[in-house]
Amino acid sequence: MGEKRTIIKALKNSAASHFIKKLTADTSLSSIQEAINVVQQYNATDPVRLKLFHTPRMVSQGAHFAFCLPTKKPHYKPLLLSQNALDEFNLVQDQDLEKILSGEKVYYSDSIFPYSTVYSGFQFGSFAAQLGDGRVVNLFDLKDKCSGQWQTFQLKGAGMTPFSRFADGKAVLRSSIREFIMSEALHSIGIPSTRAMQLTLLPGTKAQRRNQEPCAVVCRFAPSWIRLGNFNLFRWRHDLKGLIQLSDYCIEELFAGGTQFEGKPDFNIFKRDFFPDTETKIDEQVEKDETEVSTMTGDNISTLSKYDEFFRHVVSLNANTVAHWQAYGFANGVLNTDNTSIMGLTIDYGPFAFLDKFEPSFTPNHDDTAKRYSFANQPSIIWWNLQQFAKDLACLLGPEARDLELLLKGELNSVDDALEKTMIERVQKLVELSANEYKYVFTTRYAQIMSQRLGVDLDLEKCMSSTNLKDIEHAAEKAKEFCDVIVEPLLDILQATKVDYNNFFIHLQNYKGPFFIKDKSDTATLFGAFDEEYLGMFFNSKQLQQMAETEEAFAAGEKVFDANGELRLLNEKLQEIRNWTQDYLTLVPPTETAARASLAKKANPLFVPRSWVLEEVVDDLMYSQRDGLQDPSSELDTSALKKLYLMSVNPYDRTKWDVTLRPELETKWADLSHQDDAKFMMQASCSS
């Protein structure tokens, strides 16, 4: 376990700040000592200090970050602390911890000083030049006790930085609650994500959005906050030195000097497209001249440089995360390149949502009228972002070993037409191989998660991690067959019948009865062949009643009128359900109910924070307790918020939801049978 420690002790004995140690500061303040001198010589309202730490500017060529500080606020009131996160660092809760994690107190030393990073980004497909941490201040790095991995702590909503542009540096309470809860929820489900440590209300601080709103600060942490947008910046700047610095930092510091790239299959295996008919639309996003074929031709890539391996690894990490999103029905809402993590983490929570119903075209982003970032488009959009990343790295991916060595030494003074052609062809080949590997990683991981959710043991994990061609072929074949025969037909049914997406899997895992109760020849309609409880997973009560009445009418020899064709559609779905159930039972026989449930329970969260639940909790604070939010001495009722946190971070274990705390909310939020359908599939704006 390790001995519990105070935050001050942890910072003095074991903290670091790797980003500022290895990378380049803006020349306005080029060292930690210069930044410390500003703090010691000028008070918080002095124009010199305000200009250096809190005034937007274009930073110097080659800069990766700028030193800055959290803006001092009149009042701070911690609302929620993630005990799970606290335990991962063996930290005790005390006043110093609360103050440092809110920005009220700032820790710095000769090797640590707060900073904000600079990056660019493709936003809704269009390039935006210098962006950066406009309201985020990075604090320090600490190792977590489980993996021994360094985690970078930062404050979101910490005030103006050199990268705030035209914004105010604030984060409203509404979006802060949403990010805190959802980031911890995704992590607890098993979806790669950044984390949250503390949520702090800022009484007396408001932000003008559509209306004036109360503000908050979220302390969050991750192994790295570097995004693809950090690399977009250096392509735009034509800054090779800065690009190499950033790439080397990622390889050495984030991926253990490249040792994490080991154990992958021969890259040339992915000259073959193992999923040529995939519906993830990746093929449409591969920018090349030739028509896509199932197997690439041409010479193999003989050796991979560390930059090739780096690109390949980032592709795989992101493919894995998107597979989790699609399997669990998580819609990100905004997937710009500056919202795409170099480590494949779910990052920068905005207008996100879990699907209430399976609707692939749904976007939780009210402002995404073209549905660029719809649920169905997420795999292809992430691949599009990765292609921009390939362009950022092109000058490092294109050269063969000898030319790359000259480039890194600064001795590749010119590139003739022949070398340029060779370099372009090599980058194109790497991108094509990566496209096929992206589809392979995405589809096999997606099939593996979906099979678990359905209680089916496909035994894919071993093959997925193998470097053997036969194992890779086997994994691809099993994944494709499972998706074609089981997953896609099921999703078609769920999309048509519009039952709750997540709870369908819960109901199926808990079902112990017979799937069929009669042969179809013994019933008036197909409806009578099914167990009604089983059908209740696929249809709502109104649809079930319609089908039951039709069954009775046919049995009595009465005519049934179907004026709007609804009964015909229901009967078509019944036929599809029968076919699907028969296929499903070949994988999980009815006699294996216990084994099916045991496997599924490990992959099916009993609760996911829906948009309407988050809105209820936000409204409880923002409207029911409006006056108290601005009074630092008021006692706020945070019981609903704490209940939501407990349910979100313990998605597989109802016993940890604390039955003594607002027990009525468990039924209200987790059992949706009595909920108003109008609450579902809510959208949010980008305003935060």
Swiss-Prot record:
<keyword id="KW-0067">ATP-binding</keyword>
<comment type="similarity">
    <text>Belongs to the SELO family.</text>
</comment>
<keyword id="KW-0809">Transit peptide</keyword>
<comment type="function">
    <text>Catalyzes the transfer of adenosine 5'-monophosphate (AMP) to Tyr residues of target mitochondrial proteins (AMPylation). Involved in redox homeostasis by regulating the cellular response to oxidative stress. Regulates protein S-glutathionylation levels possibly by AMPylation of deglutathionylation enzymes such as glutaredoxins.</text>
</comment>
<dbReference type="GO" id="GO:0005739">
    <property type="term" value="C:mitochondrion"/>
</dbReference>
<keyword id="KW-0808">Transferase</keyword>
<dbReference type="Pfam" id="PF02696">
    <property type="entry name" value="SelO"/>
</dbReference>
<feature type="binding site">
    <location>
        <position position="348"/>
    </location>
    <ligand>
        <name>Mg(2+)</name>
    </ligand>
</feature>
<dbReference type="InterPro" id="IPR003846">
    <property type="entry name" value="SelO"/>
</dbReference>
<feature type="binding site">
    <location>
        <position position="135"/>
    </location>
    <ligand>
        <name>ATP</name>
    </ligand>
</feature>
<dbReference type="GO" id="GO:0045454">
    <property type="term" value="P:cell redox homeostasis"/>
</dbReference>
<dbReference type="GO" id="GO:0005524">
    <property type="term" value="F:ATP binding"/>
</dbReference>
<keyword id="KW-0496">Mitochondrion</keyword>
<feature type="binding site">
    <location>
        <position position="169"/>
    </location>
    <ligand>
        <name>ATP</name>
    </ligand>
</feature>
<feature type="binding site">
    <location>
        <position position="132"/>
    </location>
    <ligand>
        <name>ATP</name>
    </ligand>
</feature>
<feature type="binding site">
    <location>
        <position position="220"/>
    </location>
    <ligand>
        <name>ATP</name>
    </ligand>
</feature>
<feature type="binding site">
    <location>
        <position position="168"/>
    </location>
    <ligand>
        <name>ATP</name>
    </ligand>
</feature>
<dbReference type="GO" id="GO:0070733">
    <property type="term" value="F:AMPylase activity"/>
</dbReference>
<keyword id="KW-0460">Magnesium</keyword>
<keyword id="KW-0479">Metal-binding</keyword>
<feature type="transit peptide" description="Mitochondrion">
    <location>
        <begin position="1"/>
        <end position="23"/>
    </location>
</feature>
<protein>
    <recommendedName>
        <fullName>Protein adenylyltransferase SelO, mitochondrial</fullName>
        <ecNumber>2.7.7.-</ecNumber>
    </recommendedName>
</protein>
<keyword id="KW-0547">Nucleotide-binding</keyword>
<feature type="binding site">
    <location>
        <position position="134"/>
    </location>
    <ligand>
        <name>ATP</name>
    </ligand>
</feature>
<dbReference type="GO" id="GO:0018117">
    <property type="term" value="P:protein adenylylation"/>
</dbReference>
<dbReference type="GO" id="GO:0046872">
    <property type="term" value="F:metal ion binding"/>
</dbReference>
<keyword id="KW-1015">Disulfide bond</keyword>
<feature type="binding site">
    <location>
        <position position="348"/>
    </location>
    <ligand>
        <name>ATP</name>
    </ligand>
</feature>
<keyword id="KW-0548">Nucleotidyltransferase</keyword>
<feature type="binding site">
    <location>
        <position position="227"/>
    </location>
    <ligand>
        <name>ATP</name>
    </ligand>
</feature>
<feature type="binding site">
    <location>
        <position position="156"/>
    </location>
    <ligand>
        <name>ATP</name>
    </ligand>
</feature>
<feature type="binding site">
    <location>
        <position position="339"/>
    </location>
    <ligand>
        <name>Mg(2+)</name>
    </ligand>
</feature>
<feature type="active site" description="Proton acceptor">
    <location>
        <position position="338"/>
    </location>
</feature>
